[in-house]
Amino acid sequence: CASPLWYEDLAREGILRFKFHGGAGAEVLGALLADCAAERYSGEFDLATWVPVSKRRRRKRGYDQTELLARSACRLWETEPVRLLQKVTDNPAQSSLQGAAARRANVLGVYDAVGDCAGKRVLLLDDIVTTGETLRECARVLREAGAADVVCAAAALTPLERDSGKKA
């Protein structure tokens, strides 16, 4: 998973402010994400999408932070992100769980494909990656919906993900 930032120190503070306090900094984070993804995956994707939040969380916050990131990144590529996923279950926040197994179980069956990605190479965007289980599940759903390939990028990786060497 490509990422411009490690989720620690000032980057962590900025991302938490962005995520939970009105989306401040979306343009900056989106620009960092766009540059990183373009450098890592140049020519490897046909369209970009994002990991969606649940309808309840979107109503509570007033926005979907990862959609904001995707829109900001795509503006720099002079395109629009495509909504390909829907969160159908309002599961507990991944950050409330410990360990990859618990996080994996928490996201199984939580997402459905809602857009056409048949034969497309998809760039899947997220805000924070800890174990990669959410991205893995979303990538699985997109592949089952016909995506030719799925590559991933996030605004930040936790040190745990950085050190794991796993792929989505």
Q: Across the structure, where does each feature detected by a protein language model lie?
A:
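Conserved PRPP/pyrophosphate-binding segment of the phosphoribosyltransferase/PRPP-pathway fold
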Residues: 1-124, 131-168
